[in-house]
Structures are given as structure tokens and as C-alpha cells.
């Protein structure tokens, strides 16, 4: 039976019921709905609606139901209840009879679902933070094992300057650390309880909402009932964090897809995260990474969809807000799966050091070093830049790297060039000179690894 049937003289059309019902997705809030109901039953004792004995009976029944749901969650979807609140209340009435009908006193599904969703978000963000830190740790470990793997760094997908595979890994550690921080910040803002705000104007019972918030593990209670039941900022904020996090994972995937190509050949992915072709026997496709890259779009879509849903809603609650859950649930599921998969990809990756080194030595990645060398000899940088550009053109014409041009040919471009230029043009020198904080020098990379290890514990 619907929770609101008394006002109506006709039954809902079955097509409307199917359109309106949300149990098929909000069943995921079952545990939070039960936990919230236990806390609400305690609050009802403080205002004389329930006796201590009645509350104990309700709490015992709700705890039994909670264990039952954890053991067999699929039972919820066997019901034709409208939503998870109706299902929980129906099951409670089955267990304790008429007493179960007293539990909803002073409470609306509006503040109830807002509370359930915030509790779910807190639980799920905790899982995401764990997965995020696990991936950071995997990246740090990969970096530690590849500090000497020199490879080309890219701008515009053109070889630019030499870096190391470790430095590349640490770039993604920084991105993931920001994702972690965004989630932690979002938790601070959603950690306020809307329970006790009723439908929109507050509850008529003098419940201590701060005490109630504490029972549920919230830092405090919300301050305005109208805002409380219509606020979905936390959904937008978490979807935004997910969207940004998935952009980072998509870029991570794209880099490794490129590194894994036959043309680059910097890494080889494990058989455990690749698949073959139904036609071409030789193929080993980076499906795990391509799926991470592909799934990024659906998370961006969830954020955009939720913004469009909320942008024109008047205060307070509107049924449009039922659309807050499916996109959020899917986005969080997707992000969590991709974090785990990215860590699995790293677990079996092989870095091909000789090929990385060979590629780093090509493409005139040491051209900037020659320009800096000229600057150290007193040549203005803009002039040095032009000189080196001309030298690169000549090296390309001869099919040689810069360091293989004889001294007399280099001196045609600038008389200040001497024999001391050749050590400067080595890959190791290119790395060693980048010793400012955040640079690719071995010392800076080692410090960055140590810092990340200390932060991650």
C-alpha cells in the first residue's frame, strides 16, 4: 500500500506506478534508511511519541531487518513497493504490527531521503578515498622501480625534453592527490544532517536535531528546513569530483595506450588486462585502458544531467529530485571500477627501458640544453633559441643527433661553443640540470617519491 493513499479515490494507473516508482535504484539506500529510522525512533522517545519499550522493540526489529538486507539484498527488488522508505516501513509493520505505523510521526520522505542519500555518500566516498590512495600507492611503487627509465616527455605529442617514467607516474600521483582532497572537502560540506526538517517547514515536534545528527554520525544539523530538503549541492559537488577524477584516469589511460603502441613501444601491458581480436591472431588490445577512457564520458554526462535537472527547480522538494540517484550511483560505481582497474594495469606493466632510452635520444630533446649552454656563455636567450633552431635544422639535414655534430660545425652557428658542450648534451645532464623543486632530476624525483610515501603512510 502507498504511504499517501488516503487522499485518493482511484488507484494509480499501473503505467504511472512504474514510471513513478524508484525502488529499482533507491534500494541501494536500504541500510541508510534503516539506520536513519533507528535514530528517528530514539528522537521520538525524547518528545513522548514512543515509550522506551516501544523504541526498543522497533530498534530490535530494524536491526534484524538490517542484517536480513545485508545477507540478502536482492529480496528488496522482489517487492512492488514504491520506494525504499515504503519497503522498510512495510517490512517493519510486518514484524511489529501497528507499532510500526508510529515510526513516521513528524518525519517526511523529503528529509528522510535527503538524510539517506547523505549517509550513502559518506559511506561511498570512504570507499573511493581508499581506492584512490591504493592507486596512488601503486603509482609511487611503479615510480620507485623506474627512476632510471629515461623516456621522452611530450608537448603537442611531439618529443620535447627527456623525463623519466618515474616522473610521469608522479604527475598522476599529484592529480590523484587533488582528487582525494576534493572528496575530503566535499565530505565536510555534506556532513550536516537534514533529518527533522520534515516536508519543508520543519517538524512540529521539539526534537533536538543536533543530538539526532550526532546519533547518525553527522558533524551538525542543517540550519534551514527549506534548503535542507531541496539541497543537492553535495550530489553536484561529488559528481564534479568524479568527473574531474575520471578526466585524470582518462588521460592516464590515453598516455599508456600510446606508450603501449608498436610505434612507441615504451611499455607492455599484462595479458591480464588485455584482449585479442576475433580475426587477427597477433593482436593484443589495451581494452582495460580503452574502457577507462571511454567510461569517462558517462560520468561527465551524469554531472551535466544533474545540473540541468536542478537549474530551474523552485523551493522546496520536487519529484525531479528523484533523478539525483541513478546518475550519482552509476558515476561512483564507474569511478570506483576505473580506480581499481588502473591499479591492476600498473600491477603487471613492463617498462621497456632500452626503447624508452632510444626514443629519448631522438627528436632533439636536448635542444633546450644547448640553448641554456649558450645563455651561460653570455648569449641572450632569444638569440640562443634562434641559433639552436638553425643547428637542429642542420642536424636533421645530416640525419644526426645534435651531440654527433662535430665541433667545427657547431661553431658555425656560434663561436662560443666549445668542447665542453658535449657533456651538456647527454641525457643524464639534461635530467640532472632540472634540479629545482618539482623537476625531473634524480634527486627531485627521489624526494617526491619519499614525500608521497610519507603522505600515503
UniProtKB/Swiss-Prot annotation:
One of its GO terms (biological process) is L-arginine biosynthetic process. Pfam families: ASL_C2 (PF14698), Lyase_1 (PF00206). It is an enzyme of class 4 (lyase). It is found in: Cytoplasm. PROSITE patterns: FUMARATE_LYASES. Its EC number is 4.3.2.1. The keyword Amino-acid biosynthesis applies. Pathway: Amino-acid biosynthesis; L-arginine biosynthesis; L-arginine from L-ornithine and carbamoyl phosphate: step 3/3. It catalyses: 2-(N(omega)-L-arginino)succinate = fumarate + L-arginine. GO terms for cellular component: cytosol. Disulfide bonds: none annotated. It comes from the Bacteria. One of its GO terms (molecular function) is argininosuccinate lyase activity. Keywords: Amino-acid biosynthesis, Arginine biosynthesis, Cytoplasm, Lyase. HAMAP family: Arg_succ_lyase (MF_00006). Belongs to the lyase 1 family. Argininosuccinate lyase subfamily. NCBIfam families: argH (TIGR00838), PRK12308.1 (NF008964). PANTHER family: ARGININOSUCCINATE LYASE. This is Argininosuccinate lyase. It comes from Shigella boydii serotype 4 (strain Sb227). The lineage of its organism: Bacteria, Pseudomonadati, Pseudomonadota, Gammaproteobacteria, Enterobacterales.
Amino acid at each position: 500500500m502507498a504511504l499517501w493513499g488516503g487522499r485518493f479515490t482511484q488507484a494509480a494507473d499501473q503505467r504511472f506506478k512504474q514510471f513513478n516508482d524508484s525502488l529499482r535504484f533507491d534500494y541501494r539506500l536500504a541500510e541508510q534508511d534503516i539506520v536513519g529510522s533507528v535514530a528517528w525512533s530514539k528522537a521520538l522517545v525524547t518528545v513522548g511519541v514512543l515509550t522506551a519499550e516501544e523504541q526498543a522493540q522497533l530498534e530490535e526489529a530494524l536491526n534484524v531487518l538490517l542484517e536480513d538486507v545485508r545477507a540478502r539484498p536482492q529480496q528488496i527488488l522482489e517487492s512492488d513497493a514504491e520506494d525504499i522508505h515504503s519497503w522498510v516501513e512495510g517490512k517493519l509493520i510486518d514484524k511489529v504490527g501497528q507499532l510500526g505505523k508510529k515510526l513516521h510521526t513528524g518525519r517526511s520522505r523529503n528529509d528522510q531521503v535527503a538524510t539517506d542519500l547523505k549517509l550513502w555518500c559518506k559511506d561511498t566516498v570512504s570507499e573511493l578515498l581508499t581506492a584512490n590512495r591504493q592507486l596512488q600507492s601503486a603509482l609511487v611503487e611503479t615510480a620507485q622501480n623506474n627512476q632510471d627509465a629515461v623516456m621522452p616527455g611530450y608537448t603537442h605529442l611531439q618529443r620535447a625534453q627527456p623525463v623519466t617514467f618515474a616522473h610521469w607516474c608522479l604527475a598522476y600521483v599529484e592529480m590523484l592527490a587533488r582528487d582525494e582532497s576534493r572528496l575530503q572537502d566535499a565530505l565536510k560540506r555534506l556532513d550536516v544532517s537534514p533529518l527533522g526538517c520534515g516536508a519543508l517547514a520543519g517538524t512540529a515536534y521539539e526534537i533536538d536535531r543536533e543530538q539526532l545528527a550526532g546519533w547518525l554520525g553527522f558533524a551538525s544539523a542543517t540550519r534551514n528546513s527549506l534548503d535542507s530538503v531541496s539541497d543537492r549541492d553535495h550530489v553536484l559537488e561529488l559528481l564534479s569530483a568524479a568527473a574531474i577524477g575520471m578526466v585524470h584516469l582518462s588521460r592516464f589511460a590515453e598516455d599508456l595506450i600510446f606508450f603501449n603502441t608498436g610505434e612507441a613501444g615504451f611499455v607492455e601491458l599484462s595479458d591480464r588486462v588485455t584482449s585479442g581480436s576475433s580475426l587477427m591472431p597477433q593482436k593484443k588490445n589495451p581494452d582495460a585502458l580503452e574502457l577507462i577512457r571511454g567510461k569517462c564520458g558517462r560520468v561527465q554526462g551524469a554531472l551535466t544531467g544533474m545540473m540541468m535537472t536542478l537549474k530551474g527547480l523552485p523551493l522546496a522538494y520536487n519529484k525531479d529530485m528523484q533523478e539525483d540517484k541513478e546518475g550519482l550511483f552509476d558515476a561512483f560505481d564507474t569511478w570506483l571500477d576505473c580506480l581499481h582497474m588502473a591499479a591492476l594495469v600498473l600491477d603487471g606493466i613492463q617498462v621497456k627501458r632500452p626503447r624508452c632510452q632510444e626514443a629519448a635520444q631522438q627528436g632533439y630533446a636536448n635542444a633546450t640544453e644547448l640553448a641554456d649552454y649558450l645563455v651561460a656563455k653570455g648569449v641572450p636567450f632569444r638569440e640562443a633559441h634562434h641559433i639552436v633552431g638553425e643547428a637542429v635544422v642542420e642536424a636533421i639535414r645530416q640525419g644526426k643527433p645534435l651531440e654527433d655534430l662535430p665541433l667545427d660545425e657547431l661553431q658555425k652557428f656560434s663561436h662560443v661553443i666549445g668542447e665542453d658542450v658535449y657533456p651538456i648534451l647527454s641525457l643524464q645532464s639534461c635530467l640532472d640540470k632540472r634540479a629545482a623543486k618539482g623537476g625531473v632530476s634524480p634527486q627531485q624525483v627521489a624526494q617526491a617519491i619519499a614525500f608521497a610515501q610519507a603522505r600515503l603512510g
